[in-house]
């Protein structure tokens, strides 16, 4: 298996992984919602696709990073969604994937990496809860404790109104 950014994969590979993973862990409706989001993100030229790929079984874990534009010139990225195929959960692929993404963007001028997910998972990689006053989410959050970030720069200049990529402009995702 290997980590790749923007791999050359069949167009349905990312959406299928996300739909299968979220259907298994949440519900059929959630699987469809996140699968559709993944499809839209694969079509967004500003979004990077990251994957752990097995040469025999295809994508086993994946995530997207997309820019969060703002008025302060802060180089911000949103890490979402993230999925590990149900057959590969518990094998360390989430750790490998997230750590690889963090390392790849850390040295490339990213000021802040934001995610919305389980604090128990993301806390293991250095994410900490972030106030909506520092980085306002696009919609009210169902789980405010899931709004987290890794800050790579001076915290003083990060406070901004961040605008996410168009595929995230859906209140059902938040």
Q: Language-model features: where?
A:
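Conserved active-site alpha-helix within GNAT-family acetyltransferase domains
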Residues: 107-110, 116-142
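Conserved acetyl-CoA-binding loop-helix of GNAT-fold acetyltransferases
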Residues: 79, 84, 90-103, 114-115
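Conserved beta-strand in the GNAT
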Residues: 51, 58-69, 75-83
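Acyl-donor-binding surface of acyltransferase catalytic domains
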Residues: 70, 119-120, 146, 150
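Short amphipathic alpha-helix that is part of the acyltransferase structural core
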Residues: 1-37, 43-60, 147-148, 154-174
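Accessory recognition modules or surfaces
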Residues: 91, 95, 141-153
